[in-house]
Amino acid sequence: GZAZKGKKIFTQKCLQCHTVEAGGKHKTGPNLSGLFGRKQGQAPGFAYTDANKGKGITWKNQTLFEYLENPKKYIPGTKMVFAGLKBZTERVHLIAYLZZATKK
């Protein structure tokens, strides 16, 4: 299904900087466990930029869909170097995976 396809995308494009499992380590980017419904810039123990702390959004399907298209446009000053996923279908699949994989 969508989440299976999303896992492949995550493995190819996100895994080098992010973990998803509860209690997973921060890498270059924060651990994403508990992502959905969390305010942005709130993973405990991760050093965020002021830009990431100041946007004031809550992560959910729509905000992730917009963010993942072009992270630097959505949050100017973010240190996430990922250029974004322009393909809408890939973003839907990735978000489906994240929704499953980041549940606590």
UniProtKB/Swiss-Prot annotation:
SUPFAM superfamilies named in the record: Cytochrome c (SSF46626)
Q: Which UniProt keywords apply?
A: Electron transport, Heme, Iron, Metal-binding, Mitochondrion, Respiratory chain, Transport
Q: Where does heme c bind?
A: C14, C17, H18, M80
* Role, per record: Electron carrier protein. The oxidized form of the cytochrome c heme group can accept an electron from the heme group of the cytochrome c1 subunit of cytochrome reductase. Cytochrome c then transfers this electron to the cytochrome oxidase complex, the final protein carrier in the mitochondrial electron-transport chain.
Q: Name one Pfam family in it.
A: Cytochrom_C
Modification after translation is described as:
Binds 1 heme c group covalently per subunit.
Protein name as annotated:
Cytochrome c
